[in-house]
Amino acid sequence: MPFKKLKPLLKDILEHLNIEDATPFQKGAIPKIKSGANVYAIGSENSGKTTALILTTLQKLKDYEEHDNPRILIFVKDKNAALTLQEKFEVFTKHMNLTLYSVYEEQAVQVQKDIIYEGVDIVIGTAKRLAKLYLSNSINLNDMNTLIIEDAQLLPRIDFGADIVRISESFPKCQYVVFSTEYDEKMKSLRNSFMANSVKVEA
């Protein structure tokens, strides 16, 4: 079972949340993501994608290590999605020595730059704002080891996809994980251009 190989703290939190068994999607996706492979994880609504995203992200990070720069970037569609995901993460991170921060267009770049400079482990944000921070040297991604896209259905939008690709091209050794609710023709084409050597998990 995927949960058995998680950190004890994560298992304790799952137990506290009354989450005992992994969903079929989580059984397929969590081991693949933990292996370090680039993964397209396709699951229906309520399949447990968000929990899988959070667990694999926190499993990868060592909360006792000192890092000033972000190690995880998570792309979401808008401010609402960023804050919602951050809130779900904080159910877990309030028990850990890890910091996360959300960035989006509705807040000043300088404010975001200053907070990130103080030290953030996980940055959640819109593609447009993350690209702006990166291209203006307002975010140091030298320690980044994972780039996650919460919903691949957003990628076919030209501006969204271009912003992500622009960042990803600078970090070829990074792990890429893309979540989606479906795997259609657009996704097949996208996989060939964005993550050609990825593993696809579908449940």
Indicate residue ranges for each PLM-predicted region.
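Conserved catalytic network of the ASCE P-loop NTPase/AAA+ motor domain
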Residues: 32, 63-68, 93-96, 114-118, ...
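Post-DEXD/H (motif II) to motif III coupling segment of the RecA-like Helicase ATP-binding lobe
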Residues: 141-203
